[in-house]
């Protein structure tokens, strides 16, 4: 067994998860590879949700969509099974969390469609590679996330405001952070705003709507990126009969190298 | 009236088209703005086609998708009507071209979904801005297009090979051409291949499958980009009851500035 799960291959991590030997958060595992969020919807809602993602690519960057009834993400991880390879799942009925499980095989239906959504871990790695510090990692907490007053473009029953994540960046590095993350449109891409939280409807940085507050130091500017919590919030508002998501922080390790997601 | 249609606004061109006063090709009109290809499908095929586009973004870059039954592309051109604002349309029944018309209002159905697909005009403008010559423009012909042996990722009934367009580029500028077009993933983006046509199944550059052959000069390398003819070819193979497309070269002028499509 490898000393560090960060050195494992995606398949090695997925095997541990599939066997139930790893049920915790996936941050830092198989570090060069993209991790994916999950949304499972029934086929009748799949077109409108895919359309919502297409219209709101910054908060909803789609890495892969499974064929109806197939649990295999053929593009992102052909050897994976989305019913078993996330460490933890949440089941929502009519917008209410009813169960948290480690295997959704009993819930899987013939017309289910799985959406794998890109995650900020990929661009955080790119920032770290540039020696740009990530405060919530250094402080050992979840990234702070905020509801904004930015409207998503609606599609069918799906509509709502964009949720953003915030990372405090030294002012001299803010432009570099924008450049570096612009290379990765498949995982939220460039920031939506640098500084001035009020301008996007955030009144108090110390009171995030999701995740944990982090320290913003003298000489740092808060930088806001579109966040994958957006599609989840939008789906809950639409209150489908049933929707399955990953549990926060408990992602699928794909076979896609972070660096291969760069457009330049 | 403006001296040159290249200086007109998108809305001005669309008005002329809508009134039937302009029924020709749109190349060069409202030159700073993105032009869009069209595919209209009935709702029951829309999910699989959107999925096909999501899985094959280089040949099928989606700029906008209309809500079922709505002819208004709310993101790309909120003042436009896709039933009247393309100069010419083609109607295909079971994969066979049956009519060419200038107005599809009589054909429009309550559950029709319109897909606006990005077009190479946008990145050609970016190349021209870098003083990289575009041979088929200089020779006054259509861009040469070739079927390759590159498989698209299938989705539902949609599958087939990628079609590419070719532009001969001076060898010293080929890398620059790749860089410049990489900025525009929403309009086919980076080349799929530089040189060696045989490596993607093209046996004779002088015999394009679509469009016209162009001169490749000494010291030039053929550069291949994914082409918007791909989704059309794939749809014809699927032989839906009815599908409506724009006529080749007869595009919609959107309100999206080419330069705003750049990711960097």
UniProtKB/Swiss-Prot annotation, chains A, B:
Taxonomic superkingdom: Bacteria
Segments passing through the bilayer: none
Keyword field: Lyase
Taxonomic classification: Bacteria, Bacillati, Bacillota, Bacilli, Bacillales
Family assignment from sequence similarity: Belongs to the D-glutamate cyclase family.
Pfam families: D-Glu_cyclase (PF07286)
HAMAP family according to UniProt: Hydro_lyase
NCBIfam families: PRK05463.1
Gene3D superfamilies reported for this sequence: PSTPO5379-like, PSTPO5379-like domain
Cysteine-cysteine disulfides: none
Enzyme nomenclature, EC number: 4.2.1.-
Protein name: Putative hydro-lyase RBAM_004300
Species this chain originates from: Bacillus velezensis (strain DSM 23117 / BGSC 10A6 / LMG 26770 / FZB42)
InterPro entries the record matches: D-Glu_cyclase, Putative_hydro-lyase, UPF0317
Keyword Lyase: yes
The keyword Lyase appears for this protein: yes
Molecular functions (GO terms): lyase activity
